[in-house]
UniProtKB/Swiss-Prot annotation:
Its EC number is 5.4.3.8. Homodimer. One of its GO terms (biological process) is protoporphyrinogen IX biosynthetic process. This is Glutamate-1-semialdehyde 2,1-aminomutase. PROSITE patterns: AA_TRANSFER_CLASS_3. It comes from Methylobacillus flagellatus (strain ATCC 51484 / DSM 6875 / VKM B-1610 / KT). One of its GO terms (cellular component) is cytoplasm. One of its GO terms (molecular function) is transaminase activity. The lineage of its organism: Bacteria, Pseudomonadati, Pseudomonadota, Betaproteobacteria, Nitrosomonadales. Its main location: cytoplasm. It catalyses: (S)-4-amino-5-oxopentanoate = 5-aminolevulinate.
Length: 428
């Protein structure tokens, strides 16, 4: 029995499902989860000593790669002065200054400890500011595990939400409306019927939790126009896209200005952190200035903020995001070419340093189209690549991530490995 198998068996006796976040259990792809012990650059090593090229990147934060020297030095220097104060620090001011400089729509910002906290707090703020209860999200978009966001779409455009998790009261879920991603007609219909009752619309401006789905320009434009007309706040959940698809996030890339933005992942450099911010008149409703309460013992934790600052400073290097996007396109183009040569139905696309792999003829534009891809083929591909030393997201419904630490040799090795795996897929 491998060390990974031993650890997973032991973990299942003490930790529900053996993991502290469900996707890590390999439930979607089957098999034993990999237990990692070390990372450096674009590489990971598991408890059995096996080496992998990493395309998960801790689900997005590791944009510089693992154990980046400047980030490690910042963490060590800050930790030497204390791990936490529970009081204001100069570091959190520096972080707020940098975020508002890089993302101009965020006129003010509040630091929290996770992406879930950020989205949960932004929605509460939107409800407090507008004095409305309903919110709109899109099918297949994930915004953390707050109760009101664990809702899936019904069959009709105006169907009120039904809980997609036990423990979420139906009466709470009823305030959450859902629509298909990229469906402008359904969006216009909903706002015609209920626009004046909707506090906010929250969306991933590049969906990354139903694999990767790009927004259409018409969809984003309609969202901004309808929200402005109805007095509804537009929230961009940039926990995943923030500072990754462009220095100013997806809103810079697509030229759409939201009212509120949520951040996480990259701004912690690998440590737990989140943030939300936006229009100053909206942020003024937050306590201690306003009636909307939000607090946190570890909010603005100095060690996490130091790691985030060190990361963001690296991202400001001229050409950083162009280089990252090029590496990612080289990966997806190479994988698509390898699949085509092997006669495997496959498509791939990328946005900045994010990418999506689909066992379907075309890249999907909605959750329904994502669901039509061949998930069994993906599972075979995942395990073949894992055996070859390439670590991809263990689910057909998750985006992948490239770091600036990935070399041409890493990408070439990945494509060569994929050629062998693709050649075997149709035989299985």
């Amino acid at each position: 029995m491998s060390r990974n198998q031993q650890l997973f068996e032991q973990s299942q006796t003490l930790i529900p499902g053996g993991v502290n976040s469900p996707v890590r259990a390999f439930g979607s792809v089957g098999g034993t989860p990999v237990f990692f012990k070390r990372g450096l650059g674009a590489r990971l090593w598991d408890e059995d000593g096996k080496e992998y090229i990493d395309y998960v990147g801790s689900w997005g934060p590791m944009i510089l790669g693992h154990a980046q020297p400047d980030v490690i030095a910042a963490v060590q220097a800050t930790a030497a002065n204390s791990l936490s104060f529970g009081a204001p620090t100069a570091l959190e001011l520096e972080m707020a200054q940098l975020i508002t400089q890089l993302v101009p729509s965020m006129e003010q910002v509040r630091l929290v400890s996770s992406g879930t906290e950020a989205t949960m707090s932004a929605i509460r703020l939107a409800r407090g500011f507008t004095s409305r209860s309903k919110i709109l999200k899109f099918e297949g978009c994930y915004h953390g595990h707050a109760d009101s966001l664990l809702v899936k779409a019904g069959s009709g455009a105006l169907t009120f939400g039904q809980p997609s998790s036990a423990g979420v009261p139906p009466e709470l879920a009823a305030h959450t409306l859902t629509l298909p991603y990229n469906d402008v007609q359904a969006l216009e219909h909903l706002f015609e019927e209920l626009g004046k009752e909707i506090a906010c619309v929250i969306l991933e401006p590049v969906a990354g939790n139903m694999n990767l789905v790009r927004p259409t320009p018409e969809f984003l434009g309609a969202l901004r126009s309808l929200c402005t007309h109805s007095g509804t706040l537009l929230i961009f959940d940039e926990v995943m896209t923030g500072f990754r698809v462009a220095l100013g996030g997806a809103q810079q890339l697509f030229g759409i200005k939201p009212d509120l933005t949520t951040l996480g992942k990259v701004i912690g450099g690998g440590l737990p952190v989140g943030a939300f911010g936006g229009r100053a008149d909206v942020m003024a409703f937050l306590a201690p200035l306003g009636p909307v309460y939000q607090a946190g013992t570890l909010s603005g934790n100095p060690v996490a903020v130091a790691a985030g600052l060190a990361t963001l400073k690296q991202l400001q290097r001229p050409g950083f995001h162009e280089e990252l996007a090029l590496k990612t396109r080289q990966l997806t183009d190479g994988l698509a070419r390898a699949a085509r040569d092997a006669g495997v139905t496959f498509s791939a696309q990328s946005v900045g340093g994010m990418f999506g792999l689909y066992f379907s003829a075309e890249c999907p534009a909605s959750f329904a189209e994502v669901m039509q891809s061949d998930k069994q083929a993906f599972n075979r591909f995942f395990h073949g690549m894992l055996e070859a030393g390439v670590y991809l997201a263990p689910s057909a419904f998750e985006a992948g991530f490239v770091s600036i630490a990935h070399s041409e040799a890493d990408i070439s090795q990945t494509i060569v490995s994929a050629q062998g795996v693709f050649s075997r897929i149709n035989d299985q």
